[in-house]
Amino acid sequence: MPGVESGSVLAAVVTAAAAYFIGGIPFGIVVARLVGGRAPRSIGSGRPGGANTLRAIGPRWALVSGLLDAAKGCVAVLIPRFLGFGPEFEVLGALVAIVGHSRSPYIGFGGGRGVSVAWGTLVVIQPLVALAILPVFGGVILATRVSSLGSLLGSLFGGLMMIALVALQGLPPVYDVYAAGSVALIWIFHLDNIARLLRGTERRIDRRP
């Protein structure tokens, strides 16, 4: 029906636009400026992601920045949920927010890798998986001191767990798209890290910038 189709298009546009511009807010840069720290883009990989923010302003403020990034993911999913748009639009909001974080319109379409934002979307979509990821993510980083490896393995674990829950608990099948899409985006945004991991030259989080 034309009315239904136009309504769906409008819902998709509203969801995607809100998610992109919210996801693009560069909290790593904002927090660093507010506390008078070094610019995250001036060190390491040159991205305002979690590892560079940690190096630039220390663990306390990096945690604040990471939680704010996660909040962006939460909001991107909650907007379509509160508007009653359905799970497919929650997935759209989640994936677009991840893209917005990594391709931010506010800083010349650069950005981080999307890990914190993706975790925030997962907190709303499936909190159990969000909690289960944390020991994997943290354990890998503690063991290797390599943030990117924790992100890659944590996201893969979360994606597989999400797919398993869809099959076992009858969750909406579109969450399979969310699982595969979010993992794919995180891995794509980590391609340079993957290359360095394979060469054995990836940066450790405890290395001085």
Model-identified regions with their sequence ranges:
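Helix-coil boundary and interhelical linker segments in multi-pass alpha-helical membrane proteins
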Residues: 1-15, 71, 75-92, 123-130, ...
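N-terminal signal-anchor transmembrane alpha helix
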Residues: 10-36
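C-terminal ends of transmembrane helices
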Residues: 28-33, 98-110, 136-144, 191-199
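Cytosolic, membrane-interface loops and tails of multi-pass inner-membrane proteins
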Residues: 29-62, 110-111, 193-209
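Short, non-helical or kinked segments that cap or interrupt transmembrane helices
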Residues: 38-50, 106-119, 146-154
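Interfacial segments of multi-pass membrane proteins
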Residues: 54-57, 80-83, 96, 100, ...
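Multi-pass membrane catalytic core of lipid/isoprenoid biosynthesis enzymes
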Residues: 55-81, 110
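Loop-to-transmembrane alpha-helix initiation sites
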Residues: 131-133, 147-155, 170-182
